[in-house]
Amino acid sequence: MTTSPSITTLFLDIGGVLLTNGWDHNIRKGAADKFGLDYEEMDERHHLTFDTYEEGKLSLDGYLNRVVFYQERSFSREEFKAFMYAQSQPFPEMIELIRGLKSQHGLEIAAVSNEGRELTMYRVQQFNLGSVIDFFISSCFVHYRKPDEDMYRIALDIAQVSPERVAYIDDRAMFVEVARGLGIEGIIHTGYDTTRTALEGLGLSLKN
């Protein structure tokens, strides 16, 4: 068990860890099916412009103008956005695990996530993530995206913590590897049980 230096801070991805992904390829495919869109064309347009949206340089309406509403549609923008938002669902066990560890170990919790502003704000408010997370280092706020190392450096600066005192949980192996390269302890999230066990190995056990 790691006892020194002790972990004082958790960095967490949101999509894939605390909540379902906000707008991944499966959701986009579902949107194309529901609204009768050409998925291949939609996906090509998505990949050409989505980074700009996630980096906070384009609004959700601007993104949708480029990807969906560049021509007349039989459905409204609000109907499409309602579908997007409705896809977000929580992973209650993970949220409560982090809440419990925060309370019992006095941890600081920071979200380090790639997501556009409107989806971020909706998800934070809808699932009351502010009750668990102290800092939101989202790509749309800081204008960097993982795996850019500066994303993690900004998170370290905002949290005022040294890398060796941070454990980072993400479901993307590459993102964890980049964080490890900066001296941050990384956990590749594949499910509740394995992540809880990995945290216990760092001295962060949840007392019943």
Q: What does each of the following model-derived ranges do?
A:
Residues 69, 78-110, 121, 149, ...:
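Short, acidic loop-to-helix structural element flanking the phosphoryl-transfer center
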Residues 51-81:
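A metal-dependent, Asp-based hydrolase signature
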Residues 2-45, 182:
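Active-site neighborhood of HAD-like aspartate-dependent phosphohydrolases
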Residues 35-46, 72-82, 204-208:
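Short, surface-exposed acidic
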Residues 20, 110-114:
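Short beta-strand segments
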Residues 2-7, 12, 116-117, 121-208:
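Asp-based, Mg2+/Mn2+-dependent phosphohydrolase catalytic module
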Residues 26-30, 48, 62, 66, ...:
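Alpha-helical elements of Rossmann-like donor-binding domains used by nucleotide-donor carbohydrate transfer enzymes
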